[in-house]
């Protein structure tokens, strides 16, 4: 493993260049990115930005989370097959921001643990993915502590002339490791003023088979020894005849997208964007593997259908008369529903908890550009309305009774408001200045209507918080391909409804209760980026340090003076999020590309992250900090054939580096922690004509058994993937 990592350090991989999957000599500085919301040359941005645009790479993944995983640019945690929780520079879930087409996916119930919301965005219709590394609160507001994942779906394309013309794609994908079947169709119908883009994807996933090649030190790790069925009204723990089949991991998902573009002239656009995503029930696999005294703890534990509905209208204008030449406004509405259903083994009581969130949002951005640079002014408002319900059903008598809701059961709202200003100034001789400020105000009002079950010592939780965030940095772009950038930035995250009002258990015997006195978290970041980009090779390095102030860590707490309470029929230790810590997170990334033969490149990336906080006088590991991770590959490509042999790897995460009170899920690791691993993979794409593209991949060729840090499910074993894309 040591020699392997040395190879990574020598050859590296430019995350941005790998993401392009481009064998031409395009200079990194010439790449246009949307990190600043308006199209900007990446050389004019101090912050590190990762870019993924290869359509074959994007389309050949099982879901959007796997795009990030397989790129090697972002660590992703999974609790179940239908999941994927990105981690950027040691920050995860509600501490990073997910965006789709300029709209915030983060909402008032985004939890601080692990999320699966990213899979509700269909990767089959994605055009590009951008990753902003580090605090990005100046332009993006609350939650962007660790960074931003920007997902952009395809844009409708206009045609010449008044007559409508149609074109589109059909994609069929099959993968053996999970009996995966995915069908995708998209059609673009357009003339010179109107364009209609329609997309449909249907996905079916079976039980996920983990690798059979286990470490001799942990010969039974990850084995699925049992599964539960109910026969004649009785729960039965059955012996699993194939311990590598992770039973109860299958699910289905349907995604729809409709865009309507109207472009009355060269300088004005109107865009309607509708997205619908709905899944089947998705079993919480990690919970279904828990045991007590040799018996399963749960007979059932699953997420109900995960629904995400989005409608947005975007108005764009350019060459406007006046100080600002470019502008856009996005008004959006989202409706989100998620639920959790659980039943203990041999119990007739089945608990249903459902959350519905309605979100209204609007943001307006203006851009002034001249020979000295540009000035970007923006305003933003989002309003979240949360409804939380719960009940218990006796599956024997069908009688319903009351149980605690996950969040406050009365009227619950959050509002985000901001005004921001960002400047890019050309100082001459290759020097560029970035600086900006943002004023944030967040309001939260949660009402606890029924306190008879939990006996809350309060009936509401109200907060109004204001925060000023900003950034400043310098970049130097030399004429010989060298680039150096140094930046300072701050981030801000206001406690949301999930932080302030939630009652839940991350695992049996451990319950988290509300702490209405929780305050906002802040990050202060310094980073240095150095790179060199030439015809035959490119390399880059990023070093960062983040001070995490007012960090909310989950720690022991009391509820009505009690350190233990009865929850879900189990006497449980009480915990709550508390602003107890000042944490330090630091790390680096090295990356590069080397052209070894014509159209043949070696590419690689390696990321190291470390995070600690002080609990009194004791220094403790911060949770969510991934082990070292990365990717190395050799790729040959031309117009007809692309082939890449690559490896994805993770280093050790020793138990001494786990946060045992947080979200690191040590119960799903070995006694020593999460072992290091590496996989060998092959991906090929053959394009016999402009209308047909054929793909063949083998993931995890050696059938390695492994698991990502903090994950409750083992990764897929040897997996054969066939795909066919027909364009018309």
Language model features with spans:
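Flexible loop and strand-edge segments within Gram-negative outer membrane beta-barrel domains
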Residues: 247-253, 263-324, 335-357, 406, ...
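Surface-exposed extracellular loop regions of Gram-negative outer-membrane beta-barrel proteins
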Residues: 280, 335-339, 392-399, 443-454, ...
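Gram-negative outer-membrane beta-barrel transporters
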Residues: 428-429, 433, 441-442, 545-547, ...
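N-terminal periplasmic "start-of-domain" segments of outer-membrane beta-barrel proteins
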Residues: 30-58, 85
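N-terminal periplasmic accessory domains that precede
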Residues: 62-68, 84-87, 98-99, 116-119, ...
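Outer membrane beta-barrel strand-and-loop segments of large Gram-negative receptors
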Residues: 355, 359-365, 416-418, 513-519, ...
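Short acidic/polar hinge/loop motifs at secondary-structure boundaries
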Residues: 105-135
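Transmembrane beta-barrel wall of Gram-negative outer-membrane proteins
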Residues: 178-204, 214-281, 307-309, 427, ...
